[in-house]
């Protein structure tokens, strides 16, 4: 009715929530595709509710301009400016203090398809070329295996375009 064909879901949604959204959509007469994140950063805040970037850099994360300050390295200091030591007695220097490990839903692709997801989204913003190539190749490989083993699934892209001469390793790019 409103003229759109696809909904991009929040990355925080569970499979149960995605399934419920799909069930609601299926009860209408208008087919709508669901796009969901499968790999990328998880905000330390809740998507759409982060103000760190705006307060410190005057760049609104809620308007697509996140400076990803939570993905930077930091020193942990006490109130007097002295470095705080970790449990091994080492200074907490230049570590990822606010950054979670990237979301990796690779083990749940089949369940996501069953829940109604038709398009998978991989975060590439502010990522280097090697990271994106590695992660895209990894998911391409997994999706091709799922498609090849299920006669009811088909790829919307041309497989012959994706020729990688390396073995993708998603763990290689995590910090």
Regions found by a protein language model. Name each.
Residues 2-175:
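Surface-exposed amphipathic alpha-helical tracts and adjacent flexible/coil segments at the periphery
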């Amino acid at each position: 009715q409103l003229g759109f064909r696809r909904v991009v879901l929040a990355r925080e949604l569970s499979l149960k929530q995605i399934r419920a959204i799909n069930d609601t959509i299926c009860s209408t007469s208008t087919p709508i595709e669901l796009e969901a994140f499968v790999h990328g950063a998880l905000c330390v805040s809740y998507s759409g509710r982060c103000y760190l970037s705006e307060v410190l850099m005057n760049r609104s994360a809620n308007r697509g301009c996140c400076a990803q300050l939570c993905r930077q390295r930091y020193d942990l200091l006490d109130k007097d400016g002295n470095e705080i030591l970790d449990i091994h007695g080492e200074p907490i220097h230049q570590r990822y203090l606010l950054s979670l490990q990237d979301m990796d839903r690779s083990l749940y692709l089949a369940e996501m398809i069953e829940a109604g997801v038709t398009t998978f989204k991989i975060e590439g913003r502010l990522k280097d070329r090697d990271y994106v190539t590695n992660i895209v190749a990894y998911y391409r490989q997994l999706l091709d295996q799922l498609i090849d083993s299920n006669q009811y699934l088909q790829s919307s892209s041309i497989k012959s375009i994706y020729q990688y001469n390396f073995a993708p390793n998603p763990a290689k790019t995590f910090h």
